[in-house]
Amino acid sequence: MSVSMREMLEAGVHFGHQTRFWNPKMAPYIFGHRNKIHIINLEKSLPLFQQAQKFVRQLAANRGTILMVGTKRQAREILATEALRAGMPFVDQRWLGGMLTNFKTVKTSIKRLKDMKAQQEAGLDSLSKKEQLTFSREIDKLEKDIGGIQDMSALPNAIFVIDVGFHKIAVAEAKKLGIALIGVVDTNHSPEGIDYVIPGNDDSAKAVALYARGIADAIIEGRANAINEVVKAVAPESSDEFVEVDESAP
């Protein structure tokens, strides 16, 4: 589903931060200011968001993985919901240092979580009450820390980040590994190093919902397009030729 200028306006995407906190590198995306608040130029934001969606659509069509990241209070629930809808991994609580650069260790934790879930399903009757409590605390912590990436078997092809400044460690890790970055950048942060910059408000819950929904929609569209292409490729070509049947034949 495409996003319109009106939707961006209604979501408050154009509201930046106070002018005294601005990053000069965001100047090309700023329309002006009002009441000491920078106003983001939506005529720049909309096509850039559409470019990001196009990239995501193509990546999803090629079975790529997009890790969705948003750990700020107003982003957590909507980001997790949209990532699950799109079938993509996500980080909605806190970014663990080394989540990408030390993925080998993270995979060990993922295996531990899956093993514990299997043990939980089988029953914990053999454990004492104290052991059950310890078990419960550990699985809850693992679920909170890496639950959103438990099905991510390899490093992602791209990362979608809401607020690049707040998630500077995630951004740095992605840059180090050459992973494509799609980032919502507000007026108080630098767009440098972000492959697909989305200039916009990173605090408004409505704006965050718009970004997350738009990216999730693009992922779903990309996968659907890929499936349609496969169906077309394997479907027998229909023939409109008229074939006469000889009814006298035995």
From Swiss-Prot:
A molecular function annotated in GO for this UniProt entry is: structural constituent of ribosome
The alphabetized list of GO BP terms reads: translation
The protein's UniProt keywords, in alphabetical order, are:
Ribonucleoprotein, Ribosomal protein
Would you tell me the Gene Ontology cellular component terms?
cytosolic small ribosomal subunit
Recorded hits in Pfam families, A to Z, give:
Ribosomal_S2 (PF00318)
Coiled-coil zones: none
Which Gene3D superfamilies does the record associate with it?
Glucose-6-phosphate isomerase like protein, domain 1, Helix hairpin bin
Q: Which family does it belong to?
A: Belongs to the universal ribosomal protein uS2 family.
PANTHER family, per the entry: 30S RIBOSOMAL PROTEIN S2 PROKARYOTIC AND ORGANELLAR, SMALL RIBOSOMAL SUBUNIT PROTEIN US2M
Q: What is this protein called?
A: Small ribosomal subunit protein uS2
